[in-house]
Design a protein with these regions (language model features):
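Short, acidic (Asp/Glu-rich) active-site segment that either coordinates a divalent metal cofactor
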Residues: 78-81, 88-92
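Beta-rich nucleic-acid/ligand-interaction surfaces
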Residues: 139-141
Length: 150
């Protein structure tokens, strides 16, 4: 099954043309993770910048029976962000805001695309400590860390 032009049009309506990649050369970097051992081109790659956009993408995908694979920076080594054929890669790196730091309750509310380093630095600036220290912390994202249990 080829990825449909109709789905691409609907995704562009949700996100804007600049946030939907469909050209083969643009899809290749999203066809593997940090291992590069497993590869599969997705149907398209989309960049969401809000929870509302994520919701609209997932609603469309569900109605159209299109698989979705979420992705941060793609530094994982387990194949977790490798797409399946004709899927939507939902890249969350542009959702990179720290929304709240609650020092009293030792919590931080962040978007999925915030880097591990930014979380660590924000905690440190508040006199707190964020213990996970992956080697990829400059580029790995919190969403990816959680999704991959890293």
């Amino acid at each position: 099954m080829a990825f449909s032009d109709s789905a691409v049009s609907k995704l562009r309506a949700i996100l804007g043309t600049e946030n939907v990649l469909t050209a083969r050369e643009d899809l290749i970097p999203y066809s593997f993770d940090g291992t590069a051992a497993i590869r599969q081109l997705p149907g398209c790659v989309v960049f969401a910048t809000s929870a509302e956009q994520v919701s609209a993408i997932l609603k469309l995908a569900n109605e159209s029976k299109i698989p979705v694979v979420t992705r941060g920076s793609g530094t994982g080594l387990s194949g977790g962000s490798v797409p399946v054929e004709d899927s939507i890669v939902l890249c969350l790196v542009r959702m990179d805001k720290i929304l709240e730091l609650d020092r009293a309750n030792l919590t931080m509310l962040v978007e999925a695309g915030v880097t591990t380093l930014k979380v660590s630095e924000t905690a440190e600036a508040a006199g707190l400590f964020y213990p996970p220290d992956p080697g990829s912390m400059k580029i790995s994202t919190i969403g990816g860390n959680i999704a991959e249990n890293s």
